[in-house]
Amino acid sequence: MGKISKAVRGVADIYNGASLIVRIIVGLIIGTVLALTMPHVTWIGEFGTLFVAALKAAAPILVFVLVASALAQGTSKLDRRFGTVLFLYLFTTFLAAVVAVLTSRLFPQTLSLGKAAKADVVPQGLSEVIQTLLTNIVANPIQAIIDGNYICILMWACLFGLAMKSIANESSKAFMANVADAVSQVIRWVINLAPFGIMGLVFTNVADNGLSAFTKYGSLLLLLVGTMLLMVLVFGPLVIFIFLRRNPYPLVYRCFKESGLTAFFTRSSAANIPVNMQLCEKLGLDKDMYSVSIPLGATINMNGAAITITIMAMAAANTLGIQISLPAAILLSVVSALGACGASGVAGGSLLLIPMACSLFGISNDIAMQVVGVGFIIGVIQDSVETCLNSASDVEFAATAEYHAWLKQGRQLPAFMYSKKERAKLGIEA
């Protein structure tokens, strides 16, 4: 028995000693191989289901206790940096919609429309999306934690934290801080099991879908993914460069390696909140800031969603022979950006906001829902890339706002933001 326990400890030490990224890549490879060789062994996919469920269950509690604890301690500093984060989230979402309009004009797409998709809730206009957001803000806080309604969670956490700050004694505040630390530790344990979760998620996707999504709608999918990559590799980094005046790609690479990879397979910005918070800690960001900005980003920083809504609406217009003027294209960018900010509050996310954008061009709801149906077909890949972009950029822009403030204060940035030559000159170790 002693030999068995010793062997188990040895395996655990090897597992924990390896980099999380390396373990995730190994899980990805194993999941793909198993899906191609043993697609009938469906229980392997349960690892992915359990992993995503655990993250989704823990994330709302984590957000509530971190924000409430920070405010109760009196350490929350929602200063000018928060305004910068908010601006970056909203501006880049609009920029993503503009980029999508440009790529759609350069590479116009048409659709082969078939049976209309069915949906329980479809927003009919921008006013309905805004109304949904406002309603979500004042929802029941317990129900908000159950549903993962982060706008509501943030509001109640702020109110609860401010109330605790004014009436609670030091021992109560210390207890809240301990609860926040305990929840954070639980999240670390869950994230440590990410390789098994990724293995299950990859297994399910490959076994169920294979490469079928590429065959019928390959050009549309290529435009969607290409536009998102353009935002990731060109326009997003350009915004970061304007604020930091230095090479943005070390930060971009770090965020996509540690946040985007996980988000690609979980396909949920909410489930990736704990991963993003852990990454923010590694990047040296202020906990009082990122505990608010990251869950807010998961709600309103929707670059990928804005791209999806815009391109699908433009494709629908092209299919029906509708000529889109420049003013109409600009209006579409605004509507797509605002609508994308409400994607987290709508069942089905960005795809079910397509009819709202289509309504700008007088496209009937029946036809718009057929476009949604096409979206569901390519959704396995489109949604993965979209979530990857959305989630990784949450950290990118939170870090950009923080580092921008550091530079104004004369502080040095983390070592990875400097070149080898600069590190040697400044005496910084990598």
From Swiss-Prot:
InterPro entries of this UniProt entry?
A: Na-dicarboxylate_symporter, Na:dicarbo_symporter_sf, Ser_Thr_transp_SstT
- Membrane-crossing ranges are 24-44, 47-67, 82-102, 144-164, 186-206, 223-243, 294-314, 320-340, 361-381
Q: What is the protein's given name?
A: Serine/threonine transporter SstT
Q: Which gene encodes it?
A: sstT
| NCBIfam families per the UniProt record, alphabetical | PRK13628.1
Kindly list the biological process annotations in GO that this record carries: serine transport; threonine transport
Q: Which domain of life is it from?
A: Bacteria
Keyword Nucleotide-binding appears in the UniProt entry:
no
- Enumerate the Pfam families for this protein: SDF
UniProt keyword Metal-binding, yes or no: no
Gene Ontology cellular component annotations, sorted alphabetically:
plasma membrane
Recorded coiled-coil stretches = none
Question: Which GO MF term does the entry hold, naming one?
Answer: symporter activity
Function in brief: Involved in the import of serine and threonine into the cell, with the concomitant import of sodium (symport system).
Similarity section = Belongs to the dicarboxylate/amino acid:cation symporter (DAACS) (TC 2.A.23) family.
Ordered alphabetically, the record's keywords are: Amino-acid transport, Cell membrane, Membrane, Symport, Transmembrane, Transmembrane helix, Transport
Where in or outside the cell it occurs: the entry states: Cell membrane
The record, for HAMAP family, names: Ser_Thr_transp_SstT
As its record notes, the protein acts as a catalyst of: L-serine(in) + Na(+)(in) = L-serine(out) + Na(+)(out); L-threonine(in) + Na(+)(in) = L-threonine(out) + Na(+)(out)
The signal peptide, as residue positions, is none
How does the record classify its membrane topology? Multi-pass membrane protein
